[in-house]
Amino acid sequence: MKLVIKVTGKFFDDQGDKTPLSSAIRSLVQEGHRVALVTGGGTTARKYISLGRSLNLNEASLDLLGIWVARLNAFLMALSMPDLAYSRIPESLEQFLEYWGHGKVVVVGGFQPGQSTAAVSALVAEAISADYLVMVTTVEGVFDSDPKKNPNAKFLPRVTTTELKSILENTQSVKAGTYELLDPMAMKIVERSRIKVIVTSVDKIGKLTRIIKGEETASIVEPV
């Protein structure tokens, strides 16, 4: 299968061991999958965006700051897999497709201002006709409300994009560093190309192969 793995930037926020991610990618490749990895910017990106705001930078410039941090995280992961990953980080979809043609794992940060890394991951999934877009987040899947605010939030093993849009309504923002699980642009891409999305937690990175096989709990978002 062709897989796009989007990992929240919060995975890179602490100094903890990052080998579970590279090990999971390695396992997927060994099982015969083609893999693209997309990394977010996390707290470091938001820190630079905040510094940029203090200097009165515009939203496009703030986006660029976040993109460069996401690319740094991508470069870190590419360096950690020298035998598997293409050594350069693409800065556009055209570059991504060029690197993808070499047959290796391609690791991506951001492309251009106005796009979240969620949108980038959806674009990449669309461009390679991915079987799944796997969103690795800070929660174990999709809930009917924010589980961090509502302890009684209900876990949803299957949800449509229409239902997910309703859940996320009024929580989206287009400002740099404030994107949600799937922002409007990412949602449109998922719907127009009917990309199946799996949502899981960073705590389960080591179980990605089982998640892909449906042997581990995760949420599946069906495009409609």
UniProtKB/Swiss-Prot annotation:
Domain of life according to the entry: Archaea
Chain residues that bind ATP: K6, V7, T8, G9, K10, G42, R46, T137, F143, D146
Pathway(s) the chain acts in: Pyrimidine metabolism; CTP biosynthesis via de novo pathway; UDP from UMP (UMPK route): step 1/1
Catalysis: reaction(s): UMP + ATP = UDP + ADP
Gene Ontology terms: biological process: 'de novo' CTP biosynthetic process; UDP biosynthetic process
Regulation: Inhibited by UTP.
Residues that coordinate or bind UMP: G41, D63, F111, Q112, P113, G114, Q115, S116, T117
E.C. numbers: 2.7.4.22
Residue ranges that the Swiss-Prot or TrEMBL entry lists as coiled coil: none
Keywords, comma-separated and alphabetical: ATP-binding, Cytoplasm, Kinase, Nucleotide-binding, Pyrimidine biosynthesis, Transferase
Record's GO cellular component terms: cytoplasm
UniProt keyword ATP-binding, yes or no: yes
Pfam families per UniProt: AA_kinase
Location in the cell: Cytoplasm
An annotated Gene Ontology molecular function: UMP kinase activity
Cited HAMAP family: PyrH_A
Functional description taken from the UniProt entry: Catalyzes the reversible phosphorylation of UMP to UDP.
Family, similarity comment: Belongs to the UMP kinase family.
PANTHER family: URIDYLATE KINASE (PTHR42833), URIDYLATE KINASE PUMPKIN, CHLOROPLASTIC (PTHR42833:SF4)
Subunit structure: Homohexamer.
Name the UniProt record assigns to this protein: Uridylate kinase
